[in-house]
C-alpha cells in the first residue's frame, strides 16, 4: 500500500509523457517486449512482504502483541471484513515453501520485515530478548541464502510493540528512539553477518498520516471529527510528532550502524568510534559492510488544471508527502511550505539533529502504486487543524468525470505507470539522484470468494500493470535515474491492513480456506519468464 507525491508538469513535460505513452505500444497495439536482459547487469529483482501481513502465528513463538493486534481486535469495524492478521498467510510456518517459490521464479532478493515484538516482546531490553524470535529469522535468512536469494530486512513496518504504546504512547514520545535503537542493534548483531541491506522504517507517511491523522490504521489516533472518529488524538499535531521521532530514530540508528557495524572505507576515515576505540583498518574491514536506508512512499500528482494555483497545490502535496522526509534527509530541515503552513505544530530540528539526519542513508527505498490529480483547496475560516488539510490541496482520481487511469480494487488506486517515471526523475533533479530501490510496486484485485480457482489465477491486469511500470522504470533509468533494484508487491496474497482480506495483491494465490495453499497466478508465470537468465 502506498501514497502520494506531486510536482508541476509544464507543457513540455506533458508532451514528453504523451510521447512516452504512445511509444509504449507498437503498431499492433501491443506492449514492447521487456525482460531481465533489458536492465543493467547486477540489477536486483525481488518481492516484498511484511511481518504482520504475512507471518501469522501472532501469539506463538514468544511474540508479544503489536499495535496492529490491538487495533484489529479492539476495533474490528475499522477493517472492511472485520478480520485480523492472527493467521495472515502463515509464512511463520510455511517460510520454506515461500522461499522455494521465490527460487523457482528466479527472484534475486526478498524484502521482509522483522517483528519488533517477536524479538523484544515488551519492546525494550528490560523485558528480555525472545530467542525463539531470533531463531525464526535466522532460519528464514539461512533458507534464503541457501537458495541464493538475498535478504533485505526491514526493521519496522507499522507494528510498534503494544507495550511501548501503553508505556509512553509509542512514537509520540522521544523515549522510543533509544528503545528502537536497542532493538535495531540486536538485529545487527544477530543477523548482520548475513543481511547486507537494512531498512529502518517502511513508509513513515502511511504510518503517521493514517495512524495519527485519519485514524484508519493503528494505533488509530485522530481528532474526533476525522474519518476514523477516534476516541483520542490530535490530527493537527500528532502526525508531525510521530514522524519527527521516526526520522530521529532512523538517523540515530544509521549512525549506530555506520560506526559500529558497517565500516565502509569512508566510515573508517570519519568515524570517531573507530578512532576512539583504536580499531585498526584490518579489524574494521572484517566487519559487516552492509548498506542501510529508509523506505518512502509517494504517489505522483498531476495538477488538476493549468492554473498557477493547481500547479502550486501539486507542489505542496509533494512537499507534504515525499518532501516531508526527503528534505530533512537531503537538506536537514522540513520543506519551506510545511514550515509556513503548519507553523509551531511542526517540530523543529536542533542544529545537531539536523546534521545527524542530513545524509543519513546509503539508499532510498521507493514504494509507488498510483497517481491522482491535485488542485488548490484553501481552508475555510475557523477550520480545524489537521494534517489532512494543512497542504491546502484537494486530491482526486478524476478530472471532468474522466479518471487519470484505470481504477484497481482499492478506492484510492488509479493506475498511472507514467507517474513512476516522473517521480524518479523528480527525485533525481531535486534530491541529488540518490541510489534508489523500488521496494514496492503492484496492483490489487477484489477477493471474489465465489470465483473458481482457475479463474482467480488469471490476473492479466497484474501482468499489464507490471509490464507498463517496468517500461516506465527503464525509461527513467535511461534518463539517468539511479535505480538499482525492483521489488514487486507482493509474493503472496495477504492481510491488506484496513482492507483485510477483501483485496489480493499477490502474484501467487493463497487459499485461505484450504491450509493456506499457494498457487502461481499467471503473473507469477510471467515473472518467471521475465526473470529467465
Curated annotation (Swiss-Prot):
PANTHER family: BETA-GLUCOSIDASE 9-RELATED (PTHR10353:SF154), GLYCOSYL HYDROLASE (PTHR10353). Pfam families: Glyco_hydro_1. Disulfide bonds join 222-230. It comes from Oryza sativa subsp. japonica. This is Beta-glucosidase 10. InterPro entries: Glyco_hydro_1, Glyco_hydro_1_N_CS, Glycoside_hydrolase_SF. The lineage of its organism: Eukaryota, Viridiplantae, Streptophyta, Embryophyta, Tracheophyta. Glycans are attached at residues 122, 384, 448. One of its GO terms (molecular function) is beta-galactosidase activity. Belongs to the glycosyl hydrolase 1 family. Keywords: Disulfide bond, Glycoprotein, Glycosidase, Hydrolase, Signal.
Amino acid at each position: 500500500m502506498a501514497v502520494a507525491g506531486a510536482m508541476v508538469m509544464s507543457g513540455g513535460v506533458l508532451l514528453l509523457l504523451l510521447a512516452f505513452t504512445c511509444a509504449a505500444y507498437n503498431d499492433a497495439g501491443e506492449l514492447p517486449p521487456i525482460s531481465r536482459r533489458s536492465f543493467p547487469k547486477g540489477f536486483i529483482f525481488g518481492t516484498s512482504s511484511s511481518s504482520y501481513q504475512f507471518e501469522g502465528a501472532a501469539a506463538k513463538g514468544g511474540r508479544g502483541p503489536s499495535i496492529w493486534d490491538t487495533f484489529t481486535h479492539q476495533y474490528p469495524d475499522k477493517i472492511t471484513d472485520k478480520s485480523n492478521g492472527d493467521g495472515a498467510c502463515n509464512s511463520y510456518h510455511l517460510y520454506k515453501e515461500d522461499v522455494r517459490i521465490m527460487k523457482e521464479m528466479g527472484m534475486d532478493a526478498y524484502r521482509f520485515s522483522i517483528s519488533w515484538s517477536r524479538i523484544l516482546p515488551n519492546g525494550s531490553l528490560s523485558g528480555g530478548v525472545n530467542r525463539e524470535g531470533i531463531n525464526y529469522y535466522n532460519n528464514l535468512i539461512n533458507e534464503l541464502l541457501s537458495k541464493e536469494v538475498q535478504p533485505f530486512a526491514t526493521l519496522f513496518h507499522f507494528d510498534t510493540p503494544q507495550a511501548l504504546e501503553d508505556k509512553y504512547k509509542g512514537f509520540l514520545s522521544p523515549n522510543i528512539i533509544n528503545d528502537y535503537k536497542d532493538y535495531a542493534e540486536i538485529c545487527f548483531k544477530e543477523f548482520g553477518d548475513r543481511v547486507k541491506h537494512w531498512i529502518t522504517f517502511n513508509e513513515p507517511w502511511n504510518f503517521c498520516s493514517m495512524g495519527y491523522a485519519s485514524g484508519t490504521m493503528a494505533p488509530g489516533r485522530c481528532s474526533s471529527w476525522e474519518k476514523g472518529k477516534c476516541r483520542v488524538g490530535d490530527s493537527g499535531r500528532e502526525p508531525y510528532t510521530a514522524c519527527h521521532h521516526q526520522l530521529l530514530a532512523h538517523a540515530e540508528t544509521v549512525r549506530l550502524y555506520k560506526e559500529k557495524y558497517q565500516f565502509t572505507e569512508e566510515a573508517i576515515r570519519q568515524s570517531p568510534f573507530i578512532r576512539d576505540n583504536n580499531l585498526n583498518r584490518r579489524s574494521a574491514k572484517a566487519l559487516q559492510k552492509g548498506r542501510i536506508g529508509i523506505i518512502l512512499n509517494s504517489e505522483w500528482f498531476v495538477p488538476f488544471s493549468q492554473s498557477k494555483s493547481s500547479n502550486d497545490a501539486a507542489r505542496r502535496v509533494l512537499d507534504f508527502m515525499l518532501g516531508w522526509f526527503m528534505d530533512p534527509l537531503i537538506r536537514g530541515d522540513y520543506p519551506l511550505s510545511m514550515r509556513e503552513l503548519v507553523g509551531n505544530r511542526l517540530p523543529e530540528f536542533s542544529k545537531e539533529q539536523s546534521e545527524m539526519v542530513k545524509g543519513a542513508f546509503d539508499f532510498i527505498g521507493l514504494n509507488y502504486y498510483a497517481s491522482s490529480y491535485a488542485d488548490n483547496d484553501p481552508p475555510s475560516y475557523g477550520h480545524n487543524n489537521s494534517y489532512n488539510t494543512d497542504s491546502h490541496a484537494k486530491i482526486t482520481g478524476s478530472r471532468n468525470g474522466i479518471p487519470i487511469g484505470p481504477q484497481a480494487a482499492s478506492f484510492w488506486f488509479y493506475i498511472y505507470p507514467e507517474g513512476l517515471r516522473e517521480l524518479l526523475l523528480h527525485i533525481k533533479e531535486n534530491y541529488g539522484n540518490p541510489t534508489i530501490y523500488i521496494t514496492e510496486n503492484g496492483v490489487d484485485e477484489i477477493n471474489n470468494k465465489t470465483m473458481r480457482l482457475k479463474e482467480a489465477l488469471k490476473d492479466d491486469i497484474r501482468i499489464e500493470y507490471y509490464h507498463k511500470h517496468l517500461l516506465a522504470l527503464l525509461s527513467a533509468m535511461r534518463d539517468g535515474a539511479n535505480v538499482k533494484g525492483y521489488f514487486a508487491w507482493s509474493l503472496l496474497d495477504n492481510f491488506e491492513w484496513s482492507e483485510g482480506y477483501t483485496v489480493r495483491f499477490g502474484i501467487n494465490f493463497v487459499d485461505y480456506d484450504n491450509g493456506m495453499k499457494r498457487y502461481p497466478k499467471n503473473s507469477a508465470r510471467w515473472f518467471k519468464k521475465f526473470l529467465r537468465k
